[in-house]
Structure formats: structure tokens, C-alpha cells
From Swiss-Prot:
Substrate binds at D89, S90, G91, G92, F93, D143, Q187, G214. This is Queuine tRNA-ribosyltransferase. Signal peptide: none annotated. Pathway: tRNA modification; tRNA-queuosine biosynthesis. It catalyses: 7-aminomethyl-7-carbaguanine + guanosine(34) in tRNA = 7-aminomethyl-7-carbaguanosine(34) in tRNA + guanine. HAMAP family: Q_tRNA_Tgt. Belongs to the queuine tRNA-ribosyltransferase family. Disulfide bonds: none annotated. Binds 1 zinc ion per subunit.
């Protein structure tokens, strides 16, 4: 992977990630394909929304279908027929989400399969091996996602163990002679000094990119912004910056303003299936009865297949009847909305008009533009 940085405005960055399988324009949003599919979508449909790269889930793909079946197909690209870049998470967050059915030790994590209750062990080495079998273009280190809330001492112990796991991930990645890219994950909770210690340790080990983990796990939005403002300028400028698991459209806007290059989140797809649709004027809840006879498109500024061909009334009808097509059309729209937002942010950075773009983004939804500190590198 090669990262090119074209231009900046304040801390916002416009660039690209260049892989053998294709180029990813940044800032970028990655749709989530947990089980090797973006729910309800063919790879061609996902690509048509503007996506350059997908996220796959190491934990779930390890449990089903497993490494053996994956290798029989070649890798995850061949299995799901997506011949563009794929980033896979390490499984750490999913293990964190298991709660009481997992036990974390220095060696790794013991847990019971959420599928059949089988006892399973996952450690940094195994995570690297699984991601190698997936053929991931971007591999994430195995870490512990520090919970929120956590005391400073708890966050420190968690972060320091993640650093030790980062070294083990690096060593196993190199032993496997994996030709792809490995990203480190900065932990430390809401504590700036711990974030510094984590980042410095990761830079000493050396990675192809750096993710900010352990955010969007319940902390106040102000804390997320504060940590991003503190950490992003300290990440090596020639490496991509990835904010994991974020988020709402405004979170993407605010992340870009603070120097983030990459995002992922299930929100556009999950919300689509629940009838929450993103538009240039805010969220539309298609299940609201006022859409029953509305012949207008979801968003007259949107160029997606759904908006070009169907009315709000039709989408309301499909939802009321629990038709699969409704969830699919909603997903196409929400994913295209996210990609259009990223296209707009990239264009605004290129032309030096990011402030105007941000103002229009908020005012078109009847919202105030949030104040941010003067951000410059």
C-alpha cells in the first residue's frame, strides 16, 4: 500500500491509498460487510454507490465459514467476489462485545462461541493467521478495546497490554511474510497521556497506518473530539489515520475536520433496514404515516438508483409490507448518501472550501454549525 497526500485545509487531508487491487480516495468511508456481504447488496451494487473499499469481520468469518473454506476459494475477495481492497478488523472489538462469556489474559482471550457455545481461544498470532487467510489488503493488529467508563489505571493496563499484543501482531505478520499492510490501533481511553504512550509505542514498532480505537463506545461526543484533536496531529503525517466504528454523518464531517482519513460504521446499512434514511435535509423515518402518499423521492439532490426510480410512498409501502426490496432500496440510498458526503468533503478540501461545505451541511438540516478550536498542524 502507498499513501499519497495531495492537499490539506487546516487539519483536513485529501489523498489516496493505492493498492494492487485499486485506489481508495481519502477521506474514505468503508461499508461494513461483517459476514462477507454488505447486507442485502451484491458487490456490484455496493461499488455503484461509490465504495472503493469494504470492511470484513475477522471474528465472524473465522467462526463461519472458517479458514479452510476461505482458502479453498482463494481468499475473501474470491469468496465474496469483491476484487477491490478489503480491510479486516482483528476480532478484538467483537471479543470485547461478548461481555461475560469471555476472559482476557496476557496470552489472549478465552471465550465461548456465540454460535454453539464451543470453547475458543483467540490471540494476536491467531488473528494475524486468520487475516492472512482472508487476503486482507489492510490487516488490523489484535488489541483490547478499552471499555468506557474506565479509570485511568484500568485504561493504562489495557493500553499497555494492547501494546504488547501489537508487537506480537507485528512479529507474526512478518513471520507469515504477509505482503499486505498492517495498521496499529491507538488505545488509552479518554486520557490524553495514555493515548500519547500508546501512539509512541506503536510508532516505535512501526506500522503502515494508525487507527484510533476505543472511541464511540459510550463516551460523550466532546471527549471523542478532544482525543482526536490531541492525537491526530501526532500521528506521522505520511501514514493514513483511521477512526474505527464511526459513525453518524456529522461524526464523519467532524472527524475529517480533525484530520481523519478513513471511517467505517454499520449505521447506514443498519439504519436503512430500520427505515431511518439519511438525506441532505436530515433523517427521514420512512415508517412515518405522512410518507404514505408522498410521490417525491427521498432526496431530490441524490443520484442513487432509489431516488431516481422510486417515491417515498413506494418505500413506505414496501416497509409496511415487510418486502425485502424495501430494505435493499433503503440500503442503496443510505450507502450512496455516505459516499456522496465523502465526495463532497474531498472536493471541498481540494478547493479550499471546507468551511463553506460544513456550514451548508449543518444549515441545510436546520442545525447550528458546532464551534471547534482553531485547528492547524
Amino acid at each position: 500500500m502507498k499513501f499519497e497526500l495531495d492537499t490539506t485545509q487546516g487539519r483536513a487531508r485529501r489523498g489516496r491509498l493505492i493498492f494492487e487491487r485499486g485506489t481508495v480516495e481519502t477521506p474514505a468511508f468503508m461499508p461494513v460487510g461483517t459476514y462477507g456481504t454488505v447486507k442485502g447488496m451484491t458487490p456490484e451494487e455496493v461499488r455503484e454507490t461509490g465504495a472503493d473499499i469494504l470492511l470484513g469481520n475477522t471474528f465472524h468469518l473465522w467462526l463461519r465459514p472458517g479458514e479452510e473454506i476461505m482458502r479453498k476459494h482463494g481468499d475473501l475477495h474470491d469468496f465474496m467476489n469483491w476484487q477491490r481492497p478489503i480491510l479486516t478488523d482483528s476480532g478484538g472489538f467483537q471479543v470485547f462485545s461478548l461481555g461475560d462469556i469471555r476472559k482476557i489474559t496476557e496470552e489472549g482471550v478465552h471465550f465461548r462461541s456465540p454460535i454453539n457455545g464451543e470453547k475458543i481461544f483467540l490471540d494476536p498470532e491467531k488473528s494475524m493467521q486468520i487475516q492472512d487467510s482472508l487476503g486482507s489488503d489492510v490487516v488490523m493488529i489484535f488489541d483490547e478495546c478499552t471499555p468506557y467508563p474506565a479509570t485511568e489505571d484500568e485504561a493504562r493496563k489495557s493500553m499497555q497490554m494492547s501494546l504488547r499484543w501489537a508487537q506480537r501482531s507485528r512479529d507474526e505478520f512478518d513471520r507469515l511474510e504477509n505482503p499486505n499492510s498492517l495498521f496499529g490501533i491507538i488505545q488509552g481511553g479518554v486520557y490524553e497521556d495514555l493515548r500519547d504512550e500508546s501512539l509512541n509505542g506503536l510508532v516505535d514498532i512501526g506500522f503502515d497506518g494508525y487507527a484510533v480505537g476505543g472511541l464511540a463506545v459510550g463516551e460523550p461526543k466532546e471527549d471523542m473530539h478532544r482525543i482526536l484533536e490531541h492525537v491526530c496531529p501526532k500521528i506521522p503525517a505520511d501514514k493514513p489515520r483511521y477512526l474505527m466504528g464511526v459513525g453518524k454523518p456529522e461524526d464523519l464531517v467532524e472527524g475529517v475536520r480533525r484530520g481523519v482519513d478513513m471511517f467505517d460504521c454499520v449505521m447506514p446499512t443498519r439504519n436503512a433496514r430500520n427505515g431511518h434514511l439519511f438525506t441532505s435535509e436530515g433523517v427521514i423515518k420512512i415508517r412515518n404515516a405522512r410518507h404514505r402518499d408522498d410521490t417525491s423521492p427521498l432526496d431530490d439532490k441524490c443520484d442513487c438508483y432509489t431516488c431516481k426510480n422510486y417515491s417515498r410512498a413506494y418505500l413506505y409501502h414496501l416497509d409496511r409490507c415487510n418486502e425485502i426490496l424495501g430494505a435493499r432500496l433503503n440500503t442503496i440510498h443510505n450507502l450512496r448518501y455516505y459516499q456522496r458526503l465523502m465526495e463532497g468533503l474531498r472536493g471541498a478540501i481540494e478547493t479550499g472550501t471546507l468551511d463553506a461545505f460544513v456550514t451548508e451541511f449543518y444549515t441545510s438540516q436546520g442545525r447550528e454549525v458546532p464551534e471547534v478550536p482553531e485547528l492547524s498542524d
